[in-house]
UniProtKB/Swiss-Prot annotation:
Stretches in topological domain Lumenal: 17-123
InterPro entries: DnaJ_domain, DnaJ_domain_protein, J_dom_sf
Top-level taxon: Eukaryota
Protein family according to the UniProt entry: Belongs to the DnaJ family.
Residues of the J domain: 40-102
Source organism: Schizosaccharomyces pombe (strain 972 / ATCC 24843)
Name by which UniProt lists this protein: Uncharacterized J domain-containing protein C2E1P5.03
């Protein structure tokens, strides 16, 4: 933790402006407030950006005569700034810094210090940046936790193998090892070399292997889980309804099949009664016809 704090402190120191930078910013702001046309140091002296020191001194003599307070009392502030500007351009380091800010842009005064205003990230950019930083930190924590668990597993294996000579008994190819002064009981397989932790109460062995620790995947990180959580809460309902609807249709189909089978059974049970009714009706017709025929013969004989 202390190392991280020191790194952040050094990073903040590197980002801080130097005294020469602050002096350049003050002179630039003062020049803009006086001239109102955002003139550069080179434009004020009327020299090119690659002018030599001799050319700068020559231009300074001309401008100092022009803006001298004795000749022009209103240009007293500009005359003092002219001396500061020439001193900045005469020094190689301060001139490089001025040329750098002239090319990339000068920071603006924001209450307590000079801050860059060329790019102001919006809320979306800030949230994306925070999301990426949190994802990276979460990934690093998962990797550290995985390595720590593997190290713990390896430590158990080393302890069991170091004290293998203290084995009290054996189970076939496995030797039971109890560390002196320790509470854990290990079993070491003399053939495969596997080390297990033995629970004496339940007599269950738990395999100790660094390979059993799952490796860190992208799907385990915050970078994957948060978008998945949002998408699932937003659109998961529609995906969840599809299987339910199919189950409903299946259940409806089963109900229809059951109803059909019931109707078939009912029809099979009801069909004999219909046959019996038709047979009875046929017998009645036969009786009627049989009764009618003798009557007609008797009447013919009498005639």
């Amino acid at each position: 933790m202390s190392r991280i704090f020191i790194l952040l402190l050094l990073f903040g120191v590197c980002l801080a402006w130097t005294s020469s930078d602050l002096e350049i910013f003050r002179v630039v702001d003062s020049l803009k407030s006086i001239l109102k046309n955002k003139a550069t140091f080179y434009e004020l002296l009327e020299v090119p950006t690659k002018a030599s020191i001799k050319e700068i001194n020559r231009a300074y003599r001309k401008k100092s005569i022009l803006y001298h307070p004795d000749k022009n009392p209103k240009s007293k502030e500009l005359y003092t700034l002219l001396g500061l500007i020439v001193n900045i351009l005469r020094n190689t380091e301060t001139r490089k810094r001025y040329d750098y800010f002239l090319k990339n842009g000068f920071p603006r005064w924001k209450g307590t210090g000079y801050l860059y205003s060329r790019y102001r990230p919006g809320l979306g950019a800030v949230l994306v940046l925070l999301f990426l930083l949190i994802s990276i930190a979460h990934f690093v924590m998962l990797v550290i936790s995985s390595k720590r668990q593997k190290k713990i597993m390896q430590d158990h294996i080393d302890i069991a193998r170091q004290h293998e000579s203290y084995a009290t008994s054996a189970r076939g190819s496995k030797r039971i090892v109890q560390v002196p002064g320790g509470r854990r009981i290990y079993t070491v397989d003399s053939i495969t070399g596997q080390v297990c932790i033995l629970d004496p109460s339940s007599n269950i062995e738990y395999l100790v292997s660094p390979d059993s620790v799952a490796s860190v995947k992208i799907s385990d990180t915050f970078f994957y889980r948060l978008p998945r959580f949002i998408v699932w809460n937003a659109f998961g309902r529609w995906f969840a309804r599809a299987p339910a609807s199919s189950e409903d249709t299946d259940s409806d189909g089963q109900m229809e099949d059951e109803e059909k089978s019931d109707s078939v059974h009912k029809s099979s049970f009801s069909s004999p009664s219909k046959k019996e009714a038709s047979i009875k009706a046929g017998k009645r017709r036969m009786k009627r016809r049989a009764n009618r025929i003798p009557l007609s013969k008797n009447t013919n004989r009498e005639n």
